[in-house]
Amino acid sequence: MLQYPQIDPVALRIGPLAIHWYGLMYLIGFALVYAFGRRRITSGHTTSMTVRDLEDLIFYSVLGVVLGGRLGYVLFYKPAHYLANPLEIFYLWEGGMSFHGGLIGVIVVMLLFAHKKRLGFFTVSDFIAPLIPLGLAAGRLGNFINGELWGRPTDVPWAMIFPQSGDGLPRHPSQLYELGLEGIVLFALLWWYSSKPRAAGQVSAMFLMGYGAFRFLVEFTREPDNFLGLLAAGLSMGQWLSIPMVLAGAGLYLFTARPPSR
């Protein structure tokens, strides 16, 4: 069993202001997206997007992630609670974000952005898809530092005891699994896959399939939300939300891979 490194969730204090690691990870994630996106633009990988376009897209994507992530959590995970306590929807400091909701928020942003810039939607989504795992990796590291979203009890040699779980049981460090698969591995795969010319929509399709598949697998080691538990077929909410992603990605890939009709 490995020792969980208890890290102060506050990264920096400036007088009464406390900067938490989790919020800092969000900033680092967006900074990485900007850095690697700028590199692709300046290297001539794309002629459709400019650095200014990237800056605008990231700015509006922050809004999409926050609003979509919060509303996704409200609708997917605790609809009854927030229906009875609607003002708590705005209590962002209490936590509660959904990746799948955040993704929907970013898709809406990309649709509006593509329309405004007169670009094809897949031109935008194929450009940004390989960069999203960088933000995911930073976010999962923030989860690990916070000691939250831990895994299920296990006896594997690398199990850890997360103090906030309250039961003292060794558990999977599922945050690190997600960091590795949904973050590092998915980024490497998409960066390589998108380095060559692809039909419009195929990079986006690979992201949907890759993230959905990795999230589905990791959920077998992740402790389900205590207010939901496991749902139909013994699957978690995260798994049920990931299945449509994989199916949509597969359908999009097959559709875009078809030769043009004559």
Curated annotation (Swiss-Prot):
GO biological process, one term: lipoprotein biosynthetic process
Pathway: Protein modification; lipoprotein biosynthesis (diacylglyceryl transfer)
Listed GO MF terms: phosphatidylglycerol-prolipoprotein diacylglyceryl transferase activity
GO cellular component: plasma membrane
Entry's transmembrane regions: 17-37, 57-77, 95-115, 119-139, 173-193, 200-220, 227-247
Coiled-coil regions, chain positions: none
Keywords, in A-Z order: Cell inner membrane, Cell membrane, Membrane, Transferase, Transmembrane, Transmembrane helix
EC number: 2.5.1.145
Binding positions (a 1,2-diacyl-sn-glycero-3-phospho-(1'-sn-glycerol)): R140
Protein origin, superkingdom: Bacteria
Major subcellular location class: membrane
Record's keyword annotation contains Aminoacyl-tRNA synthetase: no
Subcellular location(s) per record: Cell inner membrane
Recorded topology in the membrane: Multi-pass membrane protein
Function: Catalyzes the transfer of the diacylglyceryl group from phosphatidylglycerol to the sulfhydryl group of the N-terminal cysteine of a prolipoprotein, the first step in the formation of mature lipoproteins.
Family: Belongs to the Lgt family.
HAMAP family, alphabetized: Lgt (MF_01147)
NCBIfam families: lgt (TIGR00544)
Protein name in UniProt: Phosphatidylglycerol--prolipoprotein diacylglyceryl transferase
